[in-house]
Amino acid sequence: MPFTPLRPGVYAPTMTFFDPSTEDLDVPTIRKHAVRLAKAGLVGLVCMGSNGEAVHLTRAERKTVINETRSALVEAGFSNVPVIAGASEQSIRGTIELCKESYEAGAEYALIVPPSYYRYATGNDQTLYEFFTSVADGSPIPLILYNYPGAVAGIDMDSDLIIRISQHPNIVGTKFTCANTGKLTRVASALHAITPPSPLAPAQRKFPSTKTEANHPYVAFGGIADFSLQTLASGGSAILAGGANVIPKLCVQIFNLWSAGRFTEAMEAQELLSRADWVLTKAAIPGTKSAIQSYYGYGGFPRRPLARLSAEQAEAVAEKIKDAMEVEKSLPDIA
């Protein structure tokens, strides 16, 4: 099947919403949220990432979230917005199986972290190489590597390893939640990652022939919204960040300003975004959902054992991101 190409721009790891009383999936809100983000100009969504509380869901629930997100986008006219699924297990066999289930549910790409439960045995370069390339061999959808040391017992893949793994034709990108812009620069340069057009980056990269033939140019994702502009200046392709659930249009605005060559304005927008994103980062999933509730009228709470914010804490989060939200609300939808 032809896959929707990954484009430069802003992506969000979407939240999974639950009934506040029963903790059952709140499917209408999951669908509404996906469409809101697409209207704001996001060019791709990740289901079942860290922000999506994948570790709190059953496999059946994961498939439901992916399927409902995909169908909501298509029905709203956003069939060109691909769904990426977090599909990580600890074994090669289990990860391939989850990739297949994600594909059946409507995902076009899979986001994969290194196996880490047996870190003493799996945290070496050769084992990680074999893990990712074996999964890529068996997956029906292309893979995006997910370098997130904080979630995988400190395993931090260096640029040499990422470049080596990414020679596989079914591996098409990396998400750098390690926030290492030097590493991102080296990987983006070595793999000829796509970059958005801009007078600030006149030498646009050409796709490697192997990836072009497969219609899969390489994508280097900045993994946190507070270095969106830095990602672009480093030759990166896109941002895939939790803050885009709350302030998507401000994230898109930074990309638009960069593309227009308006660096000073882009830097001013980045400063505002960085301050707000730090509030959301510290407040984590409960705080991000609380911010969505405060400013959009839905959001609710995470599944237990994640704690709910108190009314005072929720009010504090909303107040601290107020300046960014004023700009967010002033910006038009893109689509």
UniProtKB/Swiss-Prot annotation:
The keyword Lyase appears for this protein: yes
Site (described: Involved in proton transfer during cleavage): Y146
Catalysis performed (reactions): 2-dehydro-3-deoxy-L-galactonate = L-glyceraldehyde + pyruvate
Residues given in the record as substrate binding sites: S50, N51
Pathway in which this enzyme or protein is active: Carbohydrate acid metabolism
Lyase found in the keyword field: yes
Keywords of this entry: Carbohydrate metabolism, Lyase
GO molecular function: 4-hydroxy-tetrahydrodipicolinate synthase activity
Active site: K175
PANTHER family linked to this entry: DIHYDRODIPICOLINATE SYNTHASE, DIHYDRODIPICOLINATE SYNTHETASE FAMILY PROTEIN (AFU_ORTHOLOGUE AFUA_3G11920)
Record-given protein name: L-threo-3-deoxy-hexylosonate aldolase
Originating gene: gaaC
